[in-house]
Amino acid sequence: MKQVYIIGMGPGSRKCLTQQASEAIEHADVIIGSKRLLEAYSNTDKKLFYAVTARDIYDIINKEKALIYAVLMSGDTGFYSGTKKLTEQLYKAQEESGEKKYDINILPGISSVIYLASKIGQPWEMAAMVSLHGKKQNYIPLVLTNEWTYFLTQGDVSHICKRLCESGLGGADIWIGENLSYDNEKILSGHVSEYSEYTAAGLTVMAVNNHYPQAAVMTGLPDESFIRADIPMTKREIRASVVSRLSPAKDAIVYDIGAGTGSVSVELAMHALYGTVYAVERTKEGCELIAQNARKFGLDNIDIINASAADVIDKLPAADSVFIGGSGGELEKIMDIVLKKNPGVHIVITAVTLETLNDSVRLMEDKKVDVIDIVQIAVTQIKKRGRYHMLAANNPVFIIEGRGNR
């Protein structure tokens, strides 16, 4: 049986290795890792292999005849690490072979985030974590709603700080750690606005302290929060009901069809922070407003599509949830596509006419969609006119909610 040690190497310097990790590397016949992590062992007589993907690492372990392997992972093995994919690959191979081929040992390390937190004397247990290593993440809402946010970056500090400044966070405190644990370690501090033009090293960790965090997720934002023109907008009370009914998961794929100004897209995107909201709108003016509102609320997870929904949604990833605020007369075609892509999709439709209400219910029943609820919401606002307070009624809106049968 081959022994496989998956080792968290900490921020980089061998001084930060645990004794257990050092002993495992010392006893290993083969060391596997990235070029940066292998540099420290260039003078050893052990076999060194450069590999970073789970598949490549597994292939080396599978083909080599050695018995003890040290797989080096940057930081900690449980924090944005390749450990999960590698262990899945190894266990899958064992299951397929029907024999226990590997004795897998995971040895944790000191994450660079924890290292920076200790250097600046701040706790990290309640902080939000953002990794921008080779992927996109919607971080503005996290910084807005958390007192502390830590970033693993690829050196794009200036871009991040510019985005934070655009969202009103230029006055937040920031710490920037470069080459942590190495001899050329550097830690800078100040306000976010001071680093919007800063060129950082490749291996950079940031801590941002927002002294005035907002409530985590708001549903039913005031209508005046949004940039508007002459494009119809789903009003606050209706929007709150729609979003609460859909309640998308953090990593959900959501369609907002007939997105208008993007008010519903914005609130859905606040819930699906790690997912994507596809805002489909036929008018160019509407798409421009959606983009403006997405920027205003610091949301990177809204994908704006200027087209008729029936022409484009078949090319999108299958949706978990769909809001149809306007179908352009193609409701049946839209429903056919979303149900084909995901038979269990969650659908909410709004209607202001009896004809659209009738079509929505009939189509759901014809297509074996479970009709969960049908409600009518009639909102009357009280507005002051001189010395008097007058009732101003909005058009009643029907909300039809259904879920497909898998």
Feature annotation, model-predicted:
Residues 290-291:
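Conserved SAM-binding loop
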Residues 251-260:
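Conserved class I S-adenosyl-L-methionine
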Residues 2-6, 19-20, 51, 69, ...:
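A contiguous loop/helix-start segment that scaffolds small-molecule binding in enzyme catalytic cores
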Residues 339-393:
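C-terminal substrate-binding/active-site "lid" region of AdoMet-derived donor-dependent transferases
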Residues 270-277, 341-343:
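Conserved S-adenosyl-L-methionine
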Residues 12-13, 19, 75-145, 310-311, ...:
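Class I SAM-dependent methyltransferase SAM-binding "motif I" and its flanking Rossmann-like core
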Residues 1-105, 114, 274-277, 281, ...:
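Class I S-adenosyl-L-methionine
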Residues 261-273:
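Conserved SAM-binding loop of SAM-dependent methyltransferases across substrates and taxa
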